[in-house]
Amino acid sequence: MRITCWNVNSLKARLGHVLDYCRSGQTDCLLLQELKLADEAFPHDEFAAIGWNSACHGQKTYNGVAILSPHDINDVTKGLPCLTEDDKADDQSRYIEATVAGFRVGSIYLPNGNPCPGPKFDYKLAWMRRLHSRAQALFAEEIPAVLGGDYNVMPQEIDCYDPSAWAGDALWHMDSRAAFFLSLIH
């Protein structure tokens, strides 16, 4: 199964390119981030016209994630499970998960977290704790799973041109990096 992740930074602006990529046959499942459109504006019909299925968790102007595939998309879940009462107030469309061709796939648009420190950084770390919890639950199910997308983290020096230029940025912050590795490795 070939799975591709793409932060489209506005599906409306990139729809032609996304449709062309789907038609190219280079992937079996396409995970999109930063759709910048509400669920009701998602172009399901355009994808269906080329034989692709789609599921989205959209949000007007900001965020938004989707799963596209020529295979059936089943058991769709929108949003991460809540761990605390505060999590219930999370109205940002940053996570969608479904079963595609025997794989459990999640499309992730992790919060940026800037400015750091501050409420946006706190939200990022809380969101990453929820992601870690969900990843652990998926691993416990012992089914093939892929959580792909835009993690908004630079885990290693090789992931940026000049680490010193990112000092103080949430993408390079040690807490972000530690949470990233915790989510994926443990």
Locate each region found by the language model.
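Surface-exposed cleft-lining segments at the edges of enzyme active sites
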Residues: 81-86, 110-128, 166-169
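Active-site-proximal beta-strand elements of phosphoester/diester hydrolases
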Residues: 1-10, 102-117, 148
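Conserved small/polar residues in nucleotide/adenosyl-binding loops
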Residues: 186
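Structured beta-strand-rich core segments of catalytic domains in phosphoester-bond hydrolases
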Residues: 36, 42-115
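Short aromatic-enriched loop/helix-cap "lid" or pocket-rim segments at secondary-structure transitions
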Residues: 42-44, 157-162
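A short acidic, glycine-rich active-site loop
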Residues: 167-178
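N-terminal, active-site-proximal structural segment of metallo-dependent hydrolase catalytic domains
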Residues: 1-53, 60-65, 174
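Active-site beta-strand/loop signature of hydrolases that rely on acidic residues for catalysis
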Residues: 6-7, 22-40, 105, 134-157
